[in-house]
Regions:
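Amphipathic, non-transmembrane alpha-helical scaffold segments
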Residues: 11, 19, 61, 65, ...
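Hydrophobic/aromatic residues within well-ordered alpha-helical segments
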Residues: 14, 57, 68-72, 93-97, ...
Length: 200
């Protein structure tokens, strides 16, 4: 039993190492240009060793994407569970989302580009968007309970804010504004979300 446990741990460690290196290579060359040979060479194993853990390049890429989704979800859940006021929580949520997204190249490109060769991407997008709406909704409900927000339709408001954040992902992480101060940019956007553009 002890040996089985050790073997299981070694197998998990090998799988995690392959995932780590595959993330780097996929992010550098993209899904279409990356081959299993590229990854096997980087891991310093034969291609047949990769098949012990993953059935195909698509299977490995799916595992990479799910790992990055897991990283993002974990970071956002930490923000959601913090004991901070709703406005600060919304700010931290947007900031964490964009800052983490900058480091998740594979998930970012999978969301932005139509990777038709990988059928699971659409399912990931839908679940990811649903999770985002759910988390934003939690912040909004908390804000109304604490008498800081006035919202009449939580679902519609959450969809609107989620869509606004999604629109910022590309320009603030990789586009024209990719090098600007993220905190300052988020503060400007949050001011518009919370107070609108009307002169007061």
């Amino acid at each position: 039993m002890h040996d089985l446990g050790k073997n299981g741990n070694k197998r998990d460690a090998n799988r995690e190492n392959i995932l780590k290196i595959a993330r780097e290579i996929f992010s550098k060359y993209g899904f279409k240009k990356t081959t299993l040979d590229d990854i096997a060479n980087a891991v310093r194993k034969g291609k047949s060793s990769l098949y012990y853990y993953f059935n195909s390049k698509e299977d490995l890429f799916q595992a990479v994407i799910m790992k990055e989704v897991e990283i993002l979800a974990h970071e956002l859940e930490i923000v959601i569970n913090r004991n901070t006021d709703p406005v600060d929580k919304l700010r931290d949520y947007i900031l964490t989302k964009l800052a983490t997204f900058r480091n998740l190249a594979n998930f970012y490109h999978a969301i932005e580009n139509d990777i038709t060769a990988v059928g699971f991407i659409d399912d990931v997008k839908v679940k990811y968007e649903q999770d985002e709406i759910r988390m934003i909704k939690r912040i909004l409900i908390e804000g109304v309970r604490k008498n800081e927000f006035e919202i009449y339709d939580f679902n519609l408001a959450a969809i609107g804010i989620t869509t606004a954040i999604k629109g910022l992902e590309m320009p603030l992480t990789a586009g024209y504004y990719g090098d600007v101060n993220l905190e300052r940019s988020v503060d400007i956007i949050l001011k518009i979300i919370c107070y609108g553009i009307m002169k007061r």
